[in-house]
A protein has these predicted regions:
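ASCE P-loop NTPase helicase motor core
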Residues: 131-213
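Conserved RecA-like ASCE P-loop NTPase motor core of nucleic-acid helicases/translocases
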Residues: 55-67
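Mg2+-dependent endonuclease catalytic cores in nucleic-acid-processing enzymes, primarily RNase H-like
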Residues: 296, 304-437, 453-460, 464-465, ...
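Pre-P-loop entry segment of helicase/translocase ATPase cores
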Residues: 1-26
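Walker B catalytic acidic pair
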Residues: 127-128
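Walker A/P-loop NTP-binding motif
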Residues: 39-53
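ATPase catalytic-site recognition across NTP-hydrolyzing enzymes
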Residues: 212-287
Length: 481
């Protein structure tokens, strides 16, 4: 090349894209809002090691039709950067001059993960991560391994808020730390000699929005106005990157405002308080083994308002993963909670549970096992009418003109607070929630609500917005929810 000639720039990262691509962590999530150049950053990142002959990469979307835009963009960038590279449309794979390969794949159903069994990829990228379930993502972590010497092994993902995986993605990447701060998880590995070794794995979230993509705004000045004109939930998610409000969210009424924990106005989450002795106590239960089991205790005041005052959630700490303990052990833990907690000790407690625990078609029922000595835990079958139960949630979450809803939750009930606002609608049964989610707390609460049905409120009130002339609250929502 003549010294006066200049190399053609195929693609130049925006500052936030560059920040994402420079991260050293084994896992990184890029996104939040729309228009930040997420897909381009993922596509270009996959090229980092194509000079290594044995390098193998995989870029995933939920379904193959959704891959079309990514493939089109790869045709534009990859072919210009590597003119000799070839794309096989049948196998959905790019083959580079060195022999390196980048595949495009999908995982429409969780069972499709077995298509990648026995495979190894140095780089795995997920586009629109919230469209995937935790079991799908975690399985692919086992496929993320070196294909030969000298490769860097890591995973990258992009996404907007919303979708079936919203809850686990938020819990894994958004909630634990501020954006750009590494989230370090310590795990214990049992070695062949019987000793335990502590190991660490890090991940990070890098936020992006249309404001980080001046090239897009310059090319399409109207795009910003398009995002701003969306319905409120979609606008908050796609324009400002809010993880509290998103399209497809079932319980848009939900509010968690620490400023009102004490006065109990305009918030569903409140500070714990002593329960009067004359208030009835109810216990809801949803059985789980490989999935979490859920127990919630509720107090009922004179006005019929329900308070979730305590919970026992049988999960491992990983999304939607149960403790795998039998009904008798679950009964033991429930009874211990009621004997040791001052809010529950000595109280008459009414139990209502999923009717499925009374099934005797395969032997002794779960309900019978729990009722045996020494725990003597008794249940009555709950009303399992799904849509009616969902509507009871909506009725009770609405705020009255004085700012009080008919269902409130103690701030100590962390799993309720985590899971309920993340529930999304089922795409095929659009009036009901998607049951593939972590819906166990929702179910046990629904059984209790159906024991205390209320009529639809005559008028619904919305919580007042705080005085925020500089929109500082809105900006804070973008960075940390």
């Amino acid at each position: 090349m003549n010294r006066t000639e200049r190399a053609v720039i195929v693609w130049k990262p925006q500052p936030r894209q560059l920040e994402f691509m420079r991260r050293p962590e084994p896992e990184a999530l890029y996104g939040g809002a729309a228009g930040g150049g997420k897909s381009e950053a993922l596509l270009i990142e996959a090229l980092r090691q194509v000079h290594i002959p044995h390098y193998r990469a995989l870029i995933l979307r939920k379904t193959y039709p959704q891959l079309s835009d990514l493939v089109d963009k790869s045709q534009m960038y990859y072919r210009r950067a590597f003119p000799e590279a070839q794309y096989n449309a049948t196998s959905h794979v790019w083959v580079f001059p060195s022999g390196a390969k980048i595949w495009f794949g999908s995982m429409q159903y969780t069972k499709d993960r077995t298509n990648y069994q026995g495979k190894a990829y140095d780089f795995i990228g997920f586009d629109e991560l919230t469209h995937f379930e935790w079991d799908e993502y975690s399985y692919m972590m086992s496929r993320n391994r070196p294909t030969g010497p000298g490769t860097r092994v890591y995973m990258r993902a992009t996404t907007n808020p919303g979708g079936i995986g919203h809850g686990w993605v938020k819990a894994r990447f958004i909630t634990p730390a501020p954006p750009g701060t590494p989230i370090v998880e310590t795990v214990t590995v049992r070695l062949p000699d019987g000793t335990d070794q502590q190991m660490e794995r890090a991940r990070v979230f890098i936020p992006s929005s249309v404001f980080d993509n001046p090239a897009l705004l310059a090319n399409d000045p109207g795009y910003l106005a398009s995002l701003a004109s969306l319905p409120e939930a979609e606008k908050q998610a796609l324009l400002y990157g809010s993880w509290d409000s998103f399209s497809g969210q079932v319980f848009t009424e939900w509010r968690n405002d620490p400023a009102h924990y004490q006065d109990q106005r305009w918030t569903h989450v409140i500070a714990p308080f002593a329960i009067p002795k004359h208030w009835p106590i109810w216990r809801g239960y949803d059985f789980g083994f490989s999935k979490p089991f859920s127990v919630g205790w509720y107090a009922v005041d004179e006005e019929g308002r329900l308070y979730r005052i305590k919970e026992l959630y049988g999960c491992t700490g990983r999304p939607n993963e149960g403790l795998r303990i039998d009904p008798v052990e679950q009964a033991k833990r429930i009874r211990e909670a009621e004997q040791n907690d001052p809010l529950l000790r000595g109280r008459v407690i009414h139990g209502v549970a999923d009717p499925a625990i009374f099934d005797e078609s395969r032997g002794e029922s779960i309900a019978a096992m729990m009722e045996r000595s020494p725990h003597f835990l008794r249940w009555q079958p709950g009303d399992h009418t799904r849509l009616a139960g969902k509507m009871q949630f909506h009725y009770r979450l609405r705020f009255a003109p004085d700012g009080r809803p008919m269902l409130q939750v103690f701030s100590s009930c962390k799993h309720f607070i985590r899971t309920l606002p993340n529930l999304v609608y089922d795409e095929s049964n659009v009036e009901d929630i998607d049951t593939r989610q972590e819906d166990h707390i929702y179910d046990e609460c629904r059984y209790v609500l159906m024991e205390h049905p209320i009529s639809p409120p005559e008028a619904s009130a919305a919580p007042p917005r705080p005085d925020d002339p500089l929109e500082l609250h809105r900006q804070a929502r973008f960075y940390r929810i």
